[in-house]
């Protein structure tokens, strides 16, 4: 049984920082660097600045595709570690897969085993919702350790059975949608960053999980076009909750 520690609540709420105030970045090379952050609650933009500084100095983004795949696969754990170090242990730094997706039943798709699809079944399937999620361009390791835990969290929060397709070619998408249709779902959606859904299928955008959006406090990884974002675990959870809400709507 996996032990998931409960988030530690501070004895008293940390004083909130003023959004317009000047906040020096708590960088490791500075003499006044404080392990665990500082005694104040930073605004989201300043929390992000702390994480970006740490990630850029500690984990340079590789150019090689295989190395980038490994980098993105390790990103959830690294962001949790960075948030604990830079923002303090009094906040909840669990990523969505751990916070929401631990009770999801993950299984193979027996109808199409050759596709490598994974089915995420939430604990409550009474709504009869189904969806197909399309990998936005991650390599195989990042699909398994970064993307799919996010999909599991969305499945659990929304009460939607989700089939994740790692290589979303058009003919494979059509085949998986056909499998979903045979389950007689109440609704069927496609979760993707960019895709033209067939008639009768809603498109639920997952773009905020892989590229910065004005609606969330997130930064690019490396250079524009790299699949993935730097954001606090709290912001990742907010993005996942919003996607789940759109599936339920």
Predicted regions and their residues:
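Active-site catalytic motif of lipid deacylating hydrolases and related acyltransferases
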Residues: 147, 155-179
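Primarily recognizes the serine-hydrolase "nucleophile elbow" in alpha/beta-hydrolase
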Residues: 174-219
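Conserved beta-strand scaffold positions in the cores of enzyme catalytic domains, especially
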Residues: 117-119, 131, 162-164, 209, ...
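Short, surface-exposed "cap/lid" segments of acyl-processing enzymes
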Residues: 120-159
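A glycine/proline-hinged amphipathic helix-loop "lid/cap" segment
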Residues: 1-116
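Alpha/beta hydrolase fold serine-hydrolase catalytic domain that processes acyl esters and thioesters
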Residues: 200-249
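Acidic, polar-rich N-terminal leader regions of halophilic archaeal proteins
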Residues: 93-110, 117-134, 197-206, 237
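A structural signal for the main folded, soluble domain(s) of proteins
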Residues: 42-55, 121-123, 173-182, 195-199, ...
